[in-house]
Amino acid sequence: MKIGFLGGSFDPVHFGHLIAAQDAFEQFRLDRLILVPAAQAPLKPNDVQSSPEDRFAMLRAAVEWDQRFEVSDVELRRGGTSYTIDSARYFRKQFPRDELYWIIGGDQLPQLHLWRDVSELGQLVDFIFLERPGFPIKARVDIPGLRLHRCDGHLLAISSTELRDRVKRNLSLDYFVPHKAIVYIREKHLYRPSQ
């Protein structure tokens, strides 16, 4: 079985995340795709604004109708800083005979050498990096044993930071965020300034 993983803060989840996941799923003919929300991303300190429970619930609401995708709470249960190596070790134990692919944006390639235990990580999973057609990534990754696969993607210029700012300014999230996640954000009053 071929299983893909897409990690991130998902604060909030948006169509850029989901289209990237779908592109990798289709191009690499994955059997499953697991979204892995981080408790705290190591290279983005203090970037998360909503609770782990809210981010998990938003993500589940966004993909619950799509049987190709599932959401794991492994990093949220672990808490603290979320290192990909810890999740890769966990998933390798869960799926010892399967092909595992960690999906990243091409913008992460120049930072990959900074990831914790990246050499071991390269033994546990292959990496799929998303690249926008016509905009090749010029970064050179020189990590022995690392298996990289390019995915031509429909990368969207959407950032969760921008979306949180839109909520603060009373602007719509329509066409940026899945409807069920928008409903959740509204019901929970997420990303609003404190009263």
UniProtKB/Swiss-Prot annotation:
Catalytic activity: nicotinate beta-D-ribonucleotide + ATP + H(+) = deamido-NAD(+) + diphosphate
Enzyme Commission code(s) on record: 2.7.7.18
Molecular function (Gene Ontology), one example: ATP binding
Transferase found in the keyword field: yes
Keyword set includes ATP-binding: yes
One Gene Ontology term from the biological process aspect of the record: NAD biosynthetic process
Metabolic or biological pathway: Cofactor biosynthesis; NAD(+) biosynthesis; deamido-NAD(+) from nicotinate D-ribonucleotide: step 1/1
CDD domains, sorted: NMNAT
UniProt keyword annotations, A-Z: ATP-binding, NAD, Nucleotide-binding, Nucleotidyltransferase, Pyridine nucleotide biosynthesis, Transferase
InterPro entries linked: Cyt_trans-like (IPR004821), NadD/NMNAT (IPR005248), Rossmann-like_a/b/a_fold (IPR014729)
NCBIfam families (alphabetical): cyt_tran_rel, nicotinate (nicotinamide) nucleotide adenylyltransferase, PRK00071.1-3
Protein task: Catalyzes the reversible adenylation of nicotinate mononucleotide (NaMN) to nicotinic acid adenine dinucleotide (NaAD).
Family statement: Belongs to the NadD family.
PANTHER family assigned to the protein according to its UniProt record, in alphabetical order: NICOTINATE-NUCLEOTIDE ADENYLYLTRANSFERASE-RELATED, PHOSPHOPANTETHEINE ADENYLYLTRANSFERASE
Protein name, per record: Probable nicotinate-nucleotide adenylyltransferase
Species the sequence originates in: Opitutus terrae (strain DSM 11246 / JCM 15787 / PB90-1)
Lineage summary: Bacteria, Pseudomonadati, Verrucomicrobiota, Opitutia, Opitutales
Gene: nadD
